Amino acid sequence: MASTSAASNELVSSTINTILPTLVDGLDLNQRQSHDFFQQVLQGNIDPALMASVLTALKIKGETPEEIAGAAIAIRAAATPFPERNKEDIVADCVGTGGDGANTINISTTAAVLAAACGLKMAKHGNRSVSSMSGSADLLEAFGVNLSMSPETANHCLAQTNLCFLYAPAYHSGFKYAGPVRKAMGIRTLFNILGPLVNPAKPNIMLLGVYTPELLMPMAQALQLTGVKRAFVVHGSGLDEIALHGNTQAIEINNGELIERTISPQDFGLKNYTLEEIKGGTPAENADIIRDILSGQGKDAHNAAVIVNCAALLYLHDKAESLTQAAQLATEVLASGKGLSTLLTLVKLSNQDVSSTQTELKADK
């Protein structure tokens, strides 16, 4: 047994030693090489100088889908486990890479809440702000969501209210080994686009926004390699969301097929709004805006931004035959105020110890 482990470690070490020379020669890594390298990064086994060199070489060359997927699979495997579900159970995420610099309201987070209110199972994976004053974690914390809830509590939230939040730093402790290197480098690297791909709940449906159109195809192909069967990868005229101020470039993943699309607000039966109309603020300011939206009292532009992204999720779940029909469903649920009650239920459940809750339920019986 020990000799097998030693041989395996020796093989990984040999692989790591070939990675930088391969990249310096302008060649791509295969998925296994990328996986093994990032696996060692997460265990603290990679020298900071080598890590910085490899990240820089990947950046200069341009990361391939295999390199992205290999890293993502390694990171997800090393994450704190989320309770397994039945293979036929559908779970989705609505997430962006960040980095678009637009400082909009929290569109993807709010769309995820609305989608949960529409009956979809949403496991939202997120962090604090990257490209704005308020990230998904900042917003949900402002509402009172317990970011440090256990995986069991998060799973209970998902079962009870169709919604949970997985705070990235609570699941990906191995990132601490890369933190100082990333900070010293001061540039975007592969790590900046991995967040949407490493959700520990392993969603099988995704609405994934990217900050540049150059990432559309690589991220779509990487999603396929990580096992996602149904998704939209989108870039909306400068945003990592579906846009209202212009067209959205999209790649639809449909069971192995990649379909390039251009989507406009009119495809949802809506009109255009300016980017200025959906600008956000601090977490507290955004929380007030989101509370109005989810209670059915939001401004038209804010509502529309959330509706189009929620509608895309409904369409991917085959809850509607067209984006227009999906938008109508999202609009009806939004007007009902059910979105806010869904979020407030998440707040309540996230602050309960699921083990004690289950004990109380047994006692009641």
From Swiss-Prot:
Anthranilate 2 binds at residue 182. InterPro entries: Anthranilate_Pribosyl_Tfrase (IPR005940), Glycosyl_Trfase_fam3 (IPR000312), Glycosyl_Trfase_fam3_N_dom (IPR017459), Glycosyl_Trfase_fam3_N_dom_sf (IPR036320), Nuc_phospho_transferase (IPR035902). It catalyses: N-(5-phospho-beta-D-ribosyl)anthranilate + diphosphate = 5-phospho-alpha-D-ribose 1-diphosphate + anthranilate. It holds the Pfam family Glycos_trans_3N. Its EC number is 2.4.2.18. Its cofactor is Mg(2+). Mg(2+) 2 binds at residues 240-241. Binds 2 magnesium ions per monomer. GO terms for cellular component: cytosol. Homodimer. Belongs to the anthranilate phosphoribosyltransferase family. NCBIfam families: trpD. This is Anthranilate phosphoribosyltransferase.
